[in-house]
Each structure stands twice: as C-alpha cells, then as structure tokens.
Amino acid sequence: MVQKQIIRVCQQYQKPVIVATQMLDSMQYSRRPTRAETTDVANAILDGADACMLSGETAIGDHPRRVVEMMRRIAQSTERQYLNSRRQYLDELLGKSRIGAAGNAYLPKPQRLVHGLHPITQAVVEGASRVAAELDARLFVVASKSGVTAIARSKHRGAVPTIGLTDDPATLRQMTLYWGVTPVAVPEEADVNQLLSHVSDWGLQNGRLERGDRIVLVAGIGFGAGGHNMAMVHEV
C-alpha cells in the first residue's frame, strides 16, 4: 500500500517513479525468478511506475544478461495486457463497445491532474488524449522544451504511443524515464510544420508510421506563458 501511495504522489508532483531493490533477487544465483518476484515486477508496473531497476542481480549476480531479459519479458507482457484493457476501457467510454467494464477493475486510475502544470496545457493534453483515442491515432506527439507536458501525457497511461519532441539534450535524456514516451530530438526553434515533417519522416523511417496514419500533436504557439495551447490532427 505504501508503494502505491508513493507512486501516486510522485505522479501528482511530476516526478518519474523508479521501483527498485531486490525485485528479482533470487536470480543472483538462480536462472529463474520466484512467482512472488514476478508478481512484484508486474504489480510495480500496474501501480504506475515509470521504470523498474535491478541492482545486485546485475552488479554481482551469476546471470546479469538473463535477469535483464527476464525483467523485460515480464514488463512487456504486463504492459501488453494493461494496454489491451485500456483500449477496451476507452472504447467503452467512447461508445465503441458494449462489453462490460468489470474486467478493467484492476486498472490503476490514470493521474490526470499534474501539480504545477499550466492549466491551459493540462486542458489541451486532456482533450487531445481523448481525440487520439477516438480517431485511433497512430502516435501522440508532444513538443516540449522542459518535458513537463510529456509527463502530463504520460500520466494518462494512454494506449496511443507518445513521442516527446525537444531540442534540449537534458530534457531528451529525462524523457527516457517517462512511461510510454519515446524521446526524439528536433532542430532548435522548429515551427509546427517542421515538427510535423520531422516526426513524420522519423516515423516512416522507423516503421512507426505508414501513409494515411493520423498523428495528434500538442504544442505551444506563444499564448499563455509557457502553456501548450494547441492540439492538431495531422494525416501522414
């Protein structure tokens, strides 16, 4: 319960959450984790952690590569199930499905209100997230100098993958910790058209986009003292 509370508070105050210490401790010597350890990793992800970290398992353990692979497998399996349930839940909210929501009872409630975030930014991210879900967008793109808007999007735990665009190297590194956010560097002072062109080229080259896919972009155009006040839909 304490872990869940700490994660919830960190989300509210825009702090990335890393769950660590003895998560797969038995794998220092064993080639397989215990069921309890597997459950611990899965629960950390379902609680809303941005990352899980290994320590002794890789520092002094007998199977460092194997333990990293095991944590990756547990994380991917858990996230896959989580995102499938989120998609079903969003479909129900948007009236796309008549399936009951009982199966989604275990899902953590997304932390939508982020402490200290500009209210315009918060409202635009909220609305754009719903648009992305309703239009089955392929990517949700956030242009952010500080990375705070990417955190706000991350806390939605949306099923649409998020791309964080920034020209700041420090922000680029920070965004690697944000749940569901893939950081991508862009040229300095790029305008909206340049951002769309850059992310479209990146997506096509990396197999993340195809012609005809939709992108939802959240960016600022100078209104509201740092607030991100613009959301737009772009078709590749």
Each model region followed by its residue ranges:
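Long, charged amphipathic helices and adjacent flexible linkers at domain junctions
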Residues: 12, 72-127
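Catalytic cores of alpha/beta
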Residues: 25-47
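C-terminal binding/interaction regions
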Residues: 201, 207-223, 228-234
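Hydrophobic faces of well-ordered beta-strands that scaffold small-molecule active sites
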Residues: 17-21, 45, 52-54, 162
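C-terminal helical cap(s) of enzyme catalytic domains, especially alpha/beta-barrels
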Residues: 58-81, 229-234
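Glycine-rich phosphate-binding active-site loops on the catalytic face of alpha/beta enzymes
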Residues: 41-64
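Nucleotide-binding motor/catalytic cores of P-loop/tubulin-like NTPases across gene-expression machines
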Residues: 149-151, 157-195
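Alpha-helix-loop-beta-strand connector modules within alpha/beta enzyme cores
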Residues: 1-23, 69-86
